[in-house]
């Protein structure tokens, strides 16, 4: 099919949502996601077959090709014929590296089904679990592709019987995860060899088999085994091609937008399902109001900013005006397009159910809701499962480039919401914070290469969190004019409360009674639960006062004081986390003039600071879980390397002559680990990390770490005292 014909076919199919599949591919790093995507494209005639596998069509960012890992989720559309009917498959490739978890979460919002790729030799790995968990949470249905099956025969020399046992083990592990995460969906979503929701093969050598494909082609395990033993892989790829087997599985088992939106809208949108727009989204109605969720901003050198997202209802055309709900802005669409490989094809209009690329939505960011309905409830904000934990300072080598650097940093933050940018106007120093060392390296490289900017960066540093481990006495904060007084108590916030907010079980928009009940269950007293006013970055503010005059009209200023205190705590001006701040009493001046922002905010902030310093203050540091697979004789070298970094070994699993070590260590000690482990194992270690939350810094290191941070920030090199903030 020539290119023009393909475009016509895609244009025709985009109007038939019954024949559309919006899917993602997720996996652990290096399990073969991008190679699989390429071969699916080759099969659908989008790239030449000889090149697939080497070409890494989706890794079209130069850096991705050099590093050999997928950094951004790329979009492609292709046409596949199944049982005499053409289908339009929109495919999003997602990164498997933990440092890029944000992209995966966003891609899950745009798709209805995923192909989970698992390496037959390594089995289900930690990152497989993480990405599958994200998919299940967003109500996205999985199918399974077990990759690199040829290695079982060539490298591990397994018999056909052992091979099947190995593959059944992988399926059982994936099913265990589905059952644990979605017991309600398990019966219809479980992976089953017999019905063809699992396929096996080699993405690199372009072949695959499944039970339904065996019925069509006569190629089953026995034939696969013989072909590989005899080195006839090319023949195998001709008789049972990968794309045919996998795309058939996608069409048979993954839902169309029509089926999926009936179930998914309620999970990702909290508005009224019976409203006009609610019904239009549930029915994927092209005639309804426009409801578009942006999942990614792509910056193309010629076209500029392109907003890519999923259209849930309505039809979009150039010239239309859309509200960007979260930005309270209105933008006019310039062009609308679909993807074919990395190429954007502009069309006249696109209806609901498709993945779209729009130019002109200049205020949109990843996660925005764009619509023709004023005051539409936005889609639930996309939850990222890891928060930025590593920071580096960055400056332009040539001071003349400073304005350009600021503009580039803003652009990067818009493309990738997991990247946090802090511009310090006083020192002229800019900080970028990300999910790990690699995440930041990639961004800095992008600045140098794509924007031709010479920049200098500091070595990476870890972001600590300040917290408390005890309860403070009541602390009085006075406003500068002495007319207002605030009485504050600070204590630890129960872990269960933090978890509930993080998972979205509780939020400040929900019904008050329901929230009160849930917070009490999680360990708050009934006064605290009823008085919960604001949850901010892992901290809770509770108003437990009774009948205080003027408090309502002053509350927003009090909360601003709370937020300021939580953004940068008293110990080392690091963000706070896990703190419950209670307002137990206050005295306010009757005249609003005497209780303005300049009076209330500093009074509340300094009272909170003094209270924190009297509540057994502590630092939390981010930890990483480390998974390393090495030959057994190198186990000693690896455990020494981990233990030398304040790490602890959690468990060890042996399989054949390889051993997998699972450990955890503070991120602070993990810089340079990649090089060290490569050296210690002469490059034979396969390793990956994932975030393991925050833990208390050991008491014997507390002082040293605080001074380190204070020195770096140019603060006084002494431990702060409560009297620095309030007159005791």
Swiss-Prot record:
GO terms for cellular component: cytosol; ribonucleoprotein complex. SUPFAM superfamilies: EF-G C-terminal domain-like, P-loop containing nucleoside triphosphate hydrolases, Ribosomal protein S5 domain 2-like, Translation proteins. Gene3D superfamilies: 3.30.230.10, 3.30.70.240, Elongation Factor G (Translational Gtpase), domain 3 (3.30.70.870), P-loop containing nucleotide triphosphate hydrolases (3.40.50.300), Translation factors (2.40.30.10). Keywords: Cytoplasm, Elongation factor, GTP-binding, Nucleotide-binding, Protein biosynthesis. GTP binds at residues 27-34, 93-97, 147-150. One of its GO terms (molecular function) is GTP binding. InterPro entries: EFG_II (IPR041095), EFG_III/V (IPR035647), EFG_V-like (IPR000640), EFTu-like_2 (IPR004161), G_TR_CS (IPR031157), P-loop_NTPase (IPR027417), Ribosomal_Su5_D2-typ_SF (IPR020568), Ribsml_uS5_D2-typ_fold_subgr (IPR014721). Pfam families: EFG_C, EFG_III, EFG_IV, GTP_EFTU, GTP_EFTU_D2. It is found in: Cytoplasm. It comes from the Archaea. Residues 18-258 form the tr-type G domain. The modification Diphthamide is found at residue 594. Belongs to the TRAFAC class translation factor GTPase superfamily. Classic translation factor GTPase family. EF-G/EF-2 subfamily. HAMAP family: EF_G_EF_2_A. NCBIfam families: aEF-2, small_GTP. Catalyzes the GTP-dependent ribosomal translocation step during translation elongation. During this step, the ribosome changes from the pre-translocational (PRE) to the post-translocational (POST) state as the newly formed A-site-bound peptidyl-tRNA and P-site-bound deacylated tRNA move to the P and E sites, respectively. Catalyzes the coordinated movement of the two tRNA molecules, the mRNA and conformational changes in the ribosome. This is Elongation factor 2. It comes from Archaeoglobus fulgidus (strain ATCC 49558 / DSM 4304 / JCM 9628 / NBRC 100126 / VC-16). The lineage of its organism: Archaea, Methanobacteriati, Methanobacteriota, Archaeoglobi, Archaeoglobales. The gene is fusA.
């Amino acid at each position: 099919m020539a290119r023009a014909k393909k475009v016509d076919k895609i244009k025709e199919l985009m109007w038939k949502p019954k024949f559309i599949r919006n899917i993602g591919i997720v996996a652990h790093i290096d399990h073969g996601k991008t190679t699989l995507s390429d071969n699916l494209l080759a099969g659908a005639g989008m790239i030449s077959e000889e090149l697939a596998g080497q070409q890494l069509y989706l890794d079209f960012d130069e850096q991705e090709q050099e590093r050999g890992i997928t950094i951004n989720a790329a979009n492609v559309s292709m046409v596949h014929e199944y049982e005499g009917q053409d289908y339009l498959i929109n495919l999003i490739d997602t990164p498997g590296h933990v440092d890029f978890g944000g992209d995966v979460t966003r891609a899950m919002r745009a798709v209805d089904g995923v192909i989970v790729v698992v390496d037959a030799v390594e089995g289900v790995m930690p990152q497989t679990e993480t990405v599958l968990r994200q998919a299940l949470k967003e109500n996205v249905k999985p199918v399974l592709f077990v990759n690199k099956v040829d290695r079982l025969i060539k490298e591990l020399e397994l018999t056909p019987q052992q091979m099947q046992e190995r593959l059944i083990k992988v399926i059982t592990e994936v099913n265990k995860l589905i059952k644990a995460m979605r017991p309600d969906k398990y019966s219809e979503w479980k992976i089953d060899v017999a019905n063809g929701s699992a396929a096996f093969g080699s993405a690199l050598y372009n072949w695959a088999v499944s039970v339904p494909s065996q019925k069509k082609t006569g190629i089953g395990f026995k034939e696969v085994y013989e072909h590989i033993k005899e080195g006839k892989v090319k023949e195998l790829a001709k008789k049972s091609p990968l794309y045919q087997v996998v795309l058939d599985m996608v069409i048979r088992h993954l839902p169309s937008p029509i089926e999926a939106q009936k179930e998914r809208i309620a999970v990702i949108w909290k508005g009224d399902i019976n409203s006009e727009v609610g019904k239009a989204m549930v029915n994927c109605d092209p005639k309804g109001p426009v409801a578009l969720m942006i999942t990614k901003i792509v910056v193309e050198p010629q076209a500029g900013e392109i907003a890519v997202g999923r259209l849930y209802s309505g039809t979009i055309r150039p010239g239309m005006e859309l509200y960007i709900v979260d930005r309270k802005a209105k933008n006019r669409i310039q062009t609308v397009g679909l993807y074919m490989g990395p190429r954007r094809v502009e069309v006249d209009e696109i209806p609901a159910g498709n993945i779209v690329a729009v130019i002109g939505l200049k205020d949109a960011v990843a996660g925005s809701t764009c619509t023709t309905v004023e005051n539409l409830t936005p889609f639930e904000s996309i939850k990222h499962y890891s928060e930025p934990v590593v920071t580096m300072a960055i400056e332009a080598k040539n001071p003349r480039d400073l304005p350009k650097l600021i503009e580039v940093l803003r652009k990067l933050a818009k493309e990738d919401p997991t990247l946090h940018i802090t511009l310090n106007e006083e020192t002229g120093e800019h900080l970028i914070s990300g999910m790990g060392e690699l995440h930041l390296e990639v961004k800095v490289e992008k600045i140098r290469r794509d924007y031709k900017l010479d920049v200098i960066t500091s070595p990476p540093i870890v972001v600590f969190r300040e917290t408390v481990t005890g309860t403070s006495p009541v602390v009085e904060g006075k406003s500068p004019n002495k007319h207002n007084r605030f009485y504050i108590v600070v204590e630890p916030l129960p872990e269960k409360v933090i978890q509930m907010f993080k998972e979205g079980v509780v939020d400040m928009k929900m019904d008050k009674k329901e929230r009160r009940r849930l917070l009490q269950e999680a360990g708050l007293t009934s006064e605290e639960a009823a008085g919960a006013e604001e949850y901010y970055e892992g901290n809770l503010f509770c108003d437990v006062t009774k009948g205080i005059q003027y408090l309502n009209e002053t509350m927003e200023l009090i909360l601003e004081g709370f937020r300021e205190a939580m953004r940068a705590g008293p110990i080392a001006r690091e963000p706070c986390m896990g703190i419950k701040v209670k307002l137990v009493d206050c005295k306010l001046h009757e005249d609003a003039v005497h209780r303005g922002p300049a009076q209330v905010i500093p009074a509340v902030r300094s009272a909170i600071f003094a209270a924190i310093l009297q509540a057994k203050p502590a630092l939390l540091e981010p930890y990483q879980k480390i998974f390393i697979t090495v030959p057994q004789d190198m186990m000693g070298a690896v455990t020494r390397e981990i233990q030398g970094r304040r790490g602890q070994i959690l468990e060890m699993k042996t399989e054949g002559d390889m051993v997998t070590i699972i450990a955890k260590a503070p991120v602070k000690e993990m810089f340079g680990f990649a090089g060290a482990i490569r050296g210690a194992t002469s490059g034979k270690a396969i390793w990956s990390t994932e975030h393991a939350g925050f833990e208390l810094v050991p008491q014997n290191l507390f002082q040293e770490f605080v001074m380190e941070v204070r020195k770096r920030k140019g603060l006084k090199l002494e431990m702060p005292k409560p009297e620095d903030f309030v007159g005791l």
